Every structure is written in structure tokens, then in C-alpha cells.
Amino acid sequence: VASEMKSIESYCEKLQEFPPGNYYKNGEFTQWYQPNWANEIPTDAVSLPKLKKALEDSVHKQLMCDVPYGVLISGGLDSSVIAAIAAKYSKKRVESGDAEEAWWPRLHSFAIGLEGSPDLKAAKIVADAIGTVHHECKYTIQEGLDALRDVIYHLETYDVTTIRAATPMYLMARKIKSMGIKMVLSGEGADEVFGGYLYFHMAPNKEELHHETVRKLQKLSKYDCLRANKSMAAWGIEARVPFLGKEFLEYAMNIDPADKMCSDGKAEKYVLRKAFEGLIPDEVLWRQKEQFSDGVGYNWIDSLKANADEKVSDDNLANAKRKFPIQPPTTKEGYYYREIFDEMYPTNEAARSEEHTSELQSHLNL
């Protein structure tokens, strides 16, 4: 058992992820975490005060920390709400039952983007409103391209969407590390819990919406949580995610999914937005969901595609199945990342261990 594939990849005949919510004993995995909501359709009507308190309690619990900590603000709803709650509790030490003054009197917040990116603008609005010491991490396209190999090495994946979003996060972690911050709170998980992705507008009924939120949650360790965890851990920083706290999930995932439906013109994550109305500025509270890799600057994705077009020929892509018989790439960008991955992790087991679910297909199914 190892925390990273790179330490055992060349020694093992078979590789597999240690599944979340399991323990390992006598040569087999046993699932200890089996919540009712994973197999049943909840029927509890949402209570906005209870939802608000559940998330506040989750953030408060995650602030138990004896090292300097900060918050990540992407400029979207999720991270902004987490940051605002953290700011509320940051003046006292959680370890003392909020009786003692905090060792670090000011909460630091961090955002990253290309010059002029929408995320930087929105994050600054939130930081000013909640009173954090805010740090904008601006990067260039070339800096991002130069970091791709390191990102793939640390994340141990060739998933295109994950690499796109992880690269700016990796660069931001380097800046955070240089300031002595050891732990950060991040906003991953809210989209999965509340049906926050735009395709959830297509959910035909509450049952299908709930099934999809459960599926997304169960895949988080391979995608968003992998990105947040390993991008930060590469620089010795711990990322904590209050939206995925066990106690919070017990409440939020037992909400009747009818209350999460994007019906009657309601925005996605409507109940979350309503629960925290007044905590952050309305222009961010009601801001529409963007992919992290889009929000950091729209030129970022175009530049990644253009870079791959230069590196990978049409013939390369046409013969991808021959070179990569296990989960062959279907785009030049995917081909480029797969080449880098295979240089670092050349065994078939390494390639096979990276499960790549077609999100497009899941959207079509929904």
C-alpha cells in the first residue's frame, strides 16, 4: 500500500486505487462507510437554516489546525462561501473552543488566473467583502505549459480536464508554499452534492438527479479531489474540503432531490445560494458556474489545444489505438498528455489504473 503510484508502479503486477470509505484487512477491502443516501432517494425537505448550520459546522471543524492556514477563492459560489465562513471563525482558535485569540490574526486568501481573468476579478470582490489579506497569483500561458510535465508527474493521471484545471492550482500552491501556509480550505464537492454543473438543468426528474449526484460523488477521488489534493500536496500543503465533511454530507445528501432541481427558472445550487444570501456579494452569490480551467482565463484552454496541435500530428492521433491499446486518447491534447504519462509510468498497469469515465456519455444518459 502506498499513497502514490510512483513508489510501487515498477514493482507491482497489478495496481488499483485504495477505494474511498474502505479499510483493508486480511487481503481484502471492506466498505465501512455505507450511507443510506447512496442507495435510496431521500425525502426530507430542505431547511435552509439547518443547511447553513451544517456547512458552518463543517468549516469550523476543518479549521482545527496548529499551522498557518488560508483559503482558496476561485471567484465562484462554493469557494467564496467557504472563505466567508472561515473568515467568521478565524479570529479565534478552534482548538481552545474559540476561547483564545488566533495565533495568526489575519486570514489570507488566494486566487489564480491569467491577467484579466474573470476569476481574479470575482475573487477580489469577495476578499474585499470578507476582509481577508488577499493574494492574486497571476501566471502566463508559457508558465502553465512549462508546468505540464510536473503536473502529470504529481497527479499521476492523463485525464485532460483534470490536467487543465490542476495546472493553475499547482502554480498557485507554489506561491502559497513560499508564504509559509501549510493548510488551505477549498470548495470542491458542492457541485456534486447540489447538482451544480450546468448539465443538471437537463435532469428529467428528481430520481435521475439524485443518482447522478451520487455517481459524481463516488468518482471525486479520481477527478476533482485528486486535483485539489495532489496539486497542493506536491508543495507540502494540505487541502481540506468542508463540502465533503461526513456530517455535512449526512444532511445535504439526505435533502429531497426535488429541492435541488433547476426548475421554474431557478439557478443551479439554488438552495445553497439562498441559505447563504447576504454572506457574500450578490454578484458572486448568483454567478453562473464556470469550469475552473475556464475561469482562470479563456485563453488557457485554447493555448493548451494549440500546443498539442503542434506536438501531435494527424497521423499520430490516427494511430493512437496502436500506440496506446489501453484507453487510447481521442484528441491531440489527450494524446500529448498520454505520451508524457507513459514516459513517467510506462507499465500497462499504470495506464489501466487510470479510469476515464466519459462525462459526455453520462450527460447524455441523464
What positions do the PLM features span?
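Cysteine-centered catalytic environments shared across enzyme families
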Residues: 1-158, 283
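Conserved acidic
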Residues: 43-47, 51, 160, 164, ...
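Phosphate/ATP-binding catalytic cores across multiple sugar-kinase/actin-like superfamilies
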Residues: 49-71, 174-181, 340-352
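Short amphipathic alpha-helical face segments that pack within enzyme cores
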Residues: 50, 54, 81-85, 122-125, ...
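Short catalytic/ligand-binding loop motif for oxyanion handling, primarily in non-cytosolic enzymes
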Residues: 80-82, 143, 192-196, 201, ...
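Active-site catalytic pocket residues across diverse enzymes, especially alpha/beta-hydrolases
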Residues: 86-90, 201, 256
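Adenosyl-5′-phosphate
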Residues: 178-185, 204, 209-358, 362
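Short acidic/histidine-rich active-site segments
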Residues: 181-191, 197
